[in-house]
Amino acid sequence: MILETKKRNKNEESIPNKTTSNLNLKIKKMSKNIILSNQEIEHTIKRIAYQIYETFVEEDEIVIAGITANGFIFAQKITEALKNISPLKVSLCEVKMNKQNPELPIHTSLTKEQYTNKGLVLVDDVLNSGTTLIYAVRHFLDVPLKKFKTAVLVNRNHKKYPVKADFKGISLSTSSLEHVQVVFDEKGDSYAYLS
């Protein structure tokens, strides 16, 4: 009888369940140095959306341009928040560029005509050295814009280029050896961490 109970317990332990996978995710997150929780990211998105609306309140239409991957996801979230709080017509644009080699051509999901003479906010998740952001800024300077601003979730103070974020979630003074990563999770478990 005791033997059967042990076998049953061994079988139960080997079957992963939802609780076990959630626990594993929490353990992985705990081993990282979390700097922004999901709730803090959601609050930051709303705050930045209000700041953008205040800046562009006299415009009828603006473009939110997010740099591929996390910058674009962050831009989508800001766009959604802006649509909920303002009457502005908000267009979303994906900025496709090679972050390892930013000198390569940059492509956008909108044509130049679609953002010419409009207000534009360029969005990325983390402003590290400023390389990605400055090359993306340069791309948009080829056309006249009414206003041009930048937004980042995390602003680090180790820039190589004279570029700044007009709207930022948090600013960090870290060593140049530390890296900031942002994880956007569709299940509502997004976070930013220092590694």
What does each of the following model-derived ranges do?
Residues M1-E12, P16-S195:
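PRPP-associated nucleotide enzymes
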